[in-house]
């Protein structure tokens, strides 16, 4: 299985359940929700210790959905946040191949926040460089203090779709026909989508 995790940007949503996309791809996300509707109180000081967030990353692997031999793409343009690094490290420890999508030019200038002192590109098995500049945005506009249009989003989409095209080519060369989603906007779109999804579950790709 190919899992896609992205730290709050578009990589996972761009690739999952798209017309022309592979049914074998699985988006990965996790969060901790706490509902406790008491009266409003002053905000507590932020807790920067990583303990709790690391424990729920451990739970991601306890669910047995990510297994040795799977591939995990981890997208983070800065590559410095603790959860991203911890996810990559734990995935490798569980036998997954971890591919990082990041910016070497940007990330290498940032201080890592993980206790290991590592950035994403320093812990993964393979690095895909989206070549976003420091600060990510690339377009200068008169009258604005900061640039607009983050390069990482455009680069990530182009890189990932190119990889998917290459993957399809390689699979066909090996006699494997990958399950590809049609557009749901066709008259029979939903029926075909469910059919393709069931096919992918049965054969694994």
What is the predicted role of each segment?
Residues 7-8, 105, 184-189:
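Glycine-rich beta-alpha junction loops
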């Amino acid at each position: 299985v190919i899992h896609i995790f992205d730290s709050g940007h578009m990589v996972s949503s761009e690739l999952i359940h798209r017309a022309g996309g592979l049914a074998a791809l699985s988006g990965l996300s996790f969060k901790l929700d706490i509902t406790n509707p008491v009266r409003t109180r002053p905000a507590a000081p932020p807790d920067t210790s990583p303990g709790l967030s690391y424990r729920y990353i451990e739970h991601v692997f306890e669910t047995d959905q990510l297994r040795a031999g799977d591939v995990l793409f981890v997208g983070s343009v800065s590559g410095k946040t603790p959860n991203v690094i911890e996810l990559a490290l734990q995935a490798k420890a569980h036998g997954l191949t971890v591919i990082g999508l990041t910016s070497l030019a940007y990330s290498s200038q940032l201080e890592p926040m993980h206790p290991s002192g590592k950035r994403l590109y320093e812990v993964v098995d393979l690095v895909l460089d989206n070549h976003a500049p420091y600060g990510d945005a690339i377009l200068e506009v008169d009258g604005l203090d900061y640039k607009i249009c983050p390069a990482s989003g455009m680069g990530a989409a182009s890189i990932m779709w190119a990889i998917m095209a290459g993957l399809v080519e390689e699979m066909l060369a090996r006699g494997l026909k990958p399950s590809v989603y049609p557009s749901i906007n066709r008259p029979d779109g939903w029926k075909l989508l469910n059919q393709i999804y069931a096919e992918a579950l049965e054969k694994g790709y």
